[in-house]
């Protein structure tokens, strides 16, 4: 690897360590020419699928857009940054596991709603009300009733998932 200080291509690895999860390798390096030390990180670079929007346009997956939209729904809610990041990681892992080059934006939206429903019901309702573009108050009220009828201890009201929403995402 080329030295970032003197551009010499001859460097030596002096120390190598993996992070706790085993998905990042940290290497300490020393330049043979100028003797300066620097750190590099290696991680798998997985290609996220392109997103196909409702109008047919395609765009690259944007991690910051996903975090931003979820953060907006979670604004002023008691959810930690770590919990948000874990939810985003699960969404990205699910998208990668599909093995597709392209994914419909509707699928991403449904995955976001599924994660927000687990994190915070108010954030879920906020996101769903914008995402589903409710035509009237009755549709909004129905969503609120659906959330309110579920038990508060984390167990679903209907332990046997049914319907197209659950079939689409395998859960």
UniProtKB/Swiss-Prot annotation:
Q: Which cofactor does it need?
A: Zn(2+)
- Provide the ATP-cone domain boundaries: 49-139
Q: Which GO terms describe its biological process?
A: negative regulation of DNA-templated transcription
User: Keywords in UniProt for this one?
Assistant: ATP-binding, DNA-binding, Metal-binding, Nucleotide-binding, Repressor, Transcription, Transcription regulation, Zinc, Zinc-finger
Molecular-function GO terms, alphabetical: ATP binding; DNA binding; zinc ion binding
**Zn finger intervals (unnamed):** 3-34
Task: Tell me the superkingdom of the source.
Answer: Bacteria
Name the InterPro entries for this protein.
Answer: ATP-cone_dom, NrdR-like_N, RNR_NrdR-like
What job does the chain carry out? Negatively regulates transcription of bacterial ribonucleotide reductase nrd genes and operons by binding to NrdR-boxes.
**Record's family?**
Belongs to the NrdR family.
The record's NCBIfam families line, in alphabetical order, gives: transcriptional regulator NrdR
Q: What PANTHER family would the database entry show?
A: TRANSCRIPTIONAL REPRESSOR NRDR
What's this protein's name? Transcriptional repressor NrdR
Question: Source taxonomy lineage?
Answer: Bacteria, Pseudomonadati, Pseudomonadota, Betaproteobacteria, Rhodocyclales
């Amino acid at each position: 690897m080329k030295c970032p200080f003197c551009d010499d291509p001859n460097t030596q690895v002096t120390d190598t360590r993996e992070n706790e999860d085993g998905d990042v390798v940290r290497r300490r390096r020393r330049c043979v020419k100028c003797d300066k030390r620097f750190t590099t990180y290696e991680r798998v670079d997985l290609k996220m699928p392109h997103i196909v929007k409702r109008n047919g346009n395609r765009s690259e997956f944007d991690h910051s857009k996903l975090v931003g939209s979820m953060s907006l729904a979670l604004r002023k809610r008691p959810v930690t940054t770590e919990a948000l990041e874990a939810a985003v990681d699960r969404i990205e892992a699910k998208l990668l596991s599909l093995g597709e080059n392209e994914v419909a934006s509707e699928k991403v939206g449904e995955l976001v709603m599924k994660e927000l429903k687990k994190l915070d019901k108010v954030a879920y309702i906020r996101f769903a009300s914008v995402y589903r573009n409710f035509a009237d108050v009755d549709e909004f009220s129905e969503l609120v009733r659906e959330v309110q009828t579920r038990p508060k201890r984390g167990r679903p009201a209907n332990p046997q998932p049914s319907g197209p929403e659950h079939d689409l995402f395998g859960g």
